[in-house]
Structure formats: C-alpha cells, structure tokens
Amino acid sequence: MKAVYPGSFDPITLGHVDIIKRALSIFDELVVLVTENPRKKCMFTLEERKKLIEEVLSDLSGVKVDVHHGLLVDYLKKHGIKVLVRGLRAVTDYEYELQMALANKKLYSDLETVFLIASEKFSFISSSLVKEVALYGGDVTEWVPPEVARALNEKLKEGKR
Ligand code: ADP
C-alpha cells in the first residue's frame, strides 16, 4: 500500500525522519510530499527542501520525494493514493490536524489520515524551533540530519551577505 507524508519540511528534522522510517515499516511505498503552507513563511524554496530531503533519505528504499503546488487531494487523486500520514507531537497539534483531516475527507471521501505519535525524544523538535535557534547561532546538530545543519549554515551566511 502507498501513502503520502505531506508537510512543509522547512527544513526536514530528525522528528520528520523518525516518522518517515516508521511509516516505511507500515506502508510499501511512501511519498514525502513538500507542499506550500500559506500559514507559514518559509526559509527554503520548495525545490531546495525537496533536494535536502532526497539527500537525507538517500539510503532508504521505498521512499520518493515530490513537490506539489495546490490542493493536496488533487495530488492524491491524480496518483491514486488513499492514505495520508501525519505526525502528532502534543495536544497542541491535535486541533489543526483534526481540522485538516476532516477537511481532506470532505474533499476526498476515500481518503484516510493515519497519525503516528512522535517519539518521545523528538517530540519537542519543530522546523520553526530549529530555524529560530540556528538564526541566533545555537547548535541544532542534535535535532537535524548533518546535511540540514550544513544547509542552514549556508542559508544564514547568504542572508548576511
Ligand atoms: P505542515 O506545515 O504541513 O504542518 P510540517 O513540516 O511542520 O508541515 O509538519 C509535517 C508533519 O510532521 C505534521 O503532521 C507534523 O505534526 C509532523 N511533525 C513535525 N515535527 C515532528 C516531530 N518532531 N515528530 C513527529 N512529527 C512531527
């Protein structure tokens, strides 16, 4: 069975990677789908995020990375995929995730959203926290893959130029 794990991934963190590995133990194929979230201002472009995720996941099989502009359910219908994977960190995630899952179900009735509970050791990590700490010169190497730590450094240097 095929599933899609959609998100902003701005940038991908070890929390995301954990969800991806666990989803791969449940599903035969997983598409990590980089999407635009109009509620968020992103540091990396969609293509930069896609490339970074591909680098980070290069050793894993059964996973593909793609980008999508527009409505998520359109992508799912086009590719014949009926399962969405999302991660839940804390009760604060629940309200938004519930709203999105119900809205997507209204738009595509065959769709099921599967929630994986974040692992305890990663549950405090978010892309926004990573960006904030990196911006002020803090060490984020325990929260993101090495490729991401390097990309963050580069991006911040670019910003200072
Ligand atoms: P979006 O803008 O779509 O919420 P994110 O990249 O912030 O995109 O998150 C994508 C998904 O990954 C969401 O379901 C989110 O709850 C989940 N997620 C984010 N960080 C973690 C983490 N540290 N552990 C587990 N799941 C996470």
From Swiss-Prot:
Enzyme class: transferase
Stored InterPro entries: Cyt_trans-like, PPAT, Rossmann-like_a/b/a_fold
Pfam family, any one: CTP_transf_like
Pathway assignment: Cofactor biosynthesis; coenzyme A biosynthesis; CoA from (R)-pantothenate: step 4/5
Positions contributing to substrate binding: S8, K40, L72, R86
EC number assigned by the record: 2.7.7.3
Residues reported in the UniProt entry to bind ATP: S8, F9, H16, G87, L88, R89, E97, F122, S123, F124, I125, S126, S127, S128
Protein's cellular compartments: Cytoplasm
GO cellular component, one term: cytoplasm
Quaternary structure annotation from Swiss-Prot or TrEMBL: Homohexamer.
Family: Belongs to the bacterial CoaD family.
HAMAP family for this protein: PPAT_bact
Name assigned to this protein: Phosphopantetheine adenylyltransferase
Organism: Thermotoga petrophila (strain ATCC BAA-488 / DSM 13995 / JCM 10881 / RKU-1)
Gene expressing this chain: coaD
